[in-house]
C-alpha cells in the first residue's frame, strides 16, 4: 500500500485500454470505398473461400473488411458502410461490411437473423 508521500511523488498510472477497431477512431461506423474485392482462405483447421474487400475509409485509412452472407453485389468503387468486428479465422480482418446499406445489397431469400443482413420483413401470405 503506497503512502501519501509515494503518491505525491508519482501518481497512479491510468490503465490505457487498446481499442479492437482502431481505424474507426471511436465511431460506430464509417463510410468506405472498395478498392479491391476478392476471396481468401481461412487459417487451419477451417477451409472455405471467404469474401473480403480492401476498402479506403473516409478518414483515408485502408483496411480489409469481411462481406457477410451468401452472395454479394460489391465491386471496385462501391460505397459501403463499415462496422467493427473481427473474423476469427481470417488474420488481419477486423471489420465487417454492413449489408443493406449504401451500395451493399441485402442477402436474398433470407428468413432468419434478417436484421444482420439488411433484409426487410417478408409480406405474410
Swiss-Prot record:
Provide a Gene Ontology MF annotation, just one.
Answer: rRNA binding
Name the domain of life: Eukaryota
**Database matches in PROSITE patterns:** RIBOSOMAL_S12
Task: Write out the coiled-coil annotation as residue ranges.
Answer: none
Q: Where is the composition biased (Basic residues)?
A: 9-20
Q: Does the keyword Methyltransferase apply?
A: no
Q: Which GO terms describe its cellular component?
A: chloroplast; small ribosomal subunit
Keywords for this entry? Chloroplast, Plastid, Ribonucleoprotein, Ribosomal protein, RNA-binding, rRNA-binding
Task: Tell me where in or outside the cell this protein is found.
Answer: Plastid, Chloroplast
Positions of the UniProt region annotated as Disordered? 1-23
Q: Name one Pfam family in it.
A: Ribosom_S12_S23
* Gene3D superfamilies, A to Z: Nucleic acid-binding proteins
Main localization is plastid
Q: Which family does it belong to?
A: Belongs to the universal ribosomal protein uS12 family.
Xref: NCBIfam families: rpsL_bact
As for what it does, the entry says: With S4 and S5 plays an important role in translational accuracy. Located at the interface of the 30S and 50S subunits.
On assembly, the entry states: Part of the 30S ribosomal subunit.
Q: What is this protein called?
A: Small ribosomal subunit protein uS12c
Q: Which organism is it from?
A: Euglena gracilis
- Origin organism lineage: Eukaryota, Discoba, Euglenozoa, Euglenida, Spirocuta
